[in-house]
Curated annotation (Swiss-Prot):
Chain residues that bind Zn(2+): 175, 177, 188
PROSITE patterns linked to this entry: MPN, UPF0758
One Pfam short name: RadC
Keywords recorded for this protein, A-Z: Hydrolase, Metal-binding, Metalloprotease, Protease, Zinc
Record-annotated MPN domain positions: 104-226
Protein name: UPF0758 protein ABC2615
GO terms of biological process kind: proteolysis
Motif (JAMM motif): 175-188
Homology family: Belongs to the UPF0758 family.
A GO MF label: metal ion binding
Superkingdom of source: Bacteria
Length: 230
């Protein structure tokens, strides 16, 4: 039998938990249930939210789903599908607006945090470069390559062409591992070596190469790889 919202203790209902503990304490299911507001006669908003999220392996895939796909979930009509899509779009706009303020990169954590949300749930490797000025402000962020990264795909020419065009003082490169494990591969080390060497010739330092996993990351510089590939 499906649990209805009235069967959930009042203190454990999503809205009450939101008020008491804040949004960050809630699960994805609870956040979606709040946006849905109501369920059906047979299913609570929590159950509808659970069914919806089960249709999409990742939040990134859900965020890209067309209205027609969202409406296939029992309990979600056109109005609720539009409300969910509007909430997602608002989140995107907030993120874009935030990025208009040039962030300062003072640690690998800063760089990883800047791209981790965009990389979450991606099914292919994405290679991103952050171009910095002399004060380590990000003046440009660009996805340069998509696919299985190796030395033949990630060419220093493309990385540093953007650096020269934007008059960057340094570059930080990042890419994701869809497996969720950020451990560097031999190809990652090889690519980093070529980029370090090219940057040294051009006078544009590669400050770091960061691999982003599932809720974690590895800085090749912090792990000591830069000392062996100078």
């Amino acid at each position: 039998m499906t649990l209805l919202i009235r069967d959930v203790p009042q203190t454990e209902r999503p809205r009450e938990r939101f008020i008491r503990e804040g949004a960050k304490a809630l699960s994805n299911q609870e956040i979606v249930a709040i946006l849905l507001r109501t369920g059906t006669k047979q299913s609570s908003a929590l159950h509808v939210a659970s069914t919806l999220l089960s249709q999409f392996p990742t939040l990134a895939m859900f965020s890209e789903a067309p209205l027609e796909e969202i409406q296939k979930v029992p309990g979600i009509g056109m109005a609720k599908a539009i409300e969910l899509s509007a909430a997602i779009e608002l989140g995107r706009r907030i993120q874009r607006e935030t990025k208009l303020v040039r962030p300062v990169i003072s640690s690998p954590e800063d760089a990883a945090e800047l791209v981790s949300e965009d990389m979450r749930g991606l099914q292919q490797e994405h290679f991103v470069a952050l171009y910095l000025n002399t004060k380590n402000h990000v003046i440009k962020q660009k996805t340069l390559f998509i696919g299985s990264l190796n030395a033949s795909i990630v060419h220093p020419r493309e990385v540093f062409k953007e650096a020269l065009q934007s008059s960057s003082a340094s570059v930080i490169c990042l890419h994701n591992h869809p497996s969720g494990d950020p451990s560097p591969s031999p190809e990652d080390i090889s690519v980093t070596k070529r980029l370090r060497q090219a940057g040294a010739i051009l006078g544009i330092e590669l400050l770091d190469h960061i691999i982003v996993g599932d809720g974690c990351f590895i800085s090749l510089k912090e792990r000591g790889f830069f000392a062996t590939i100078s």
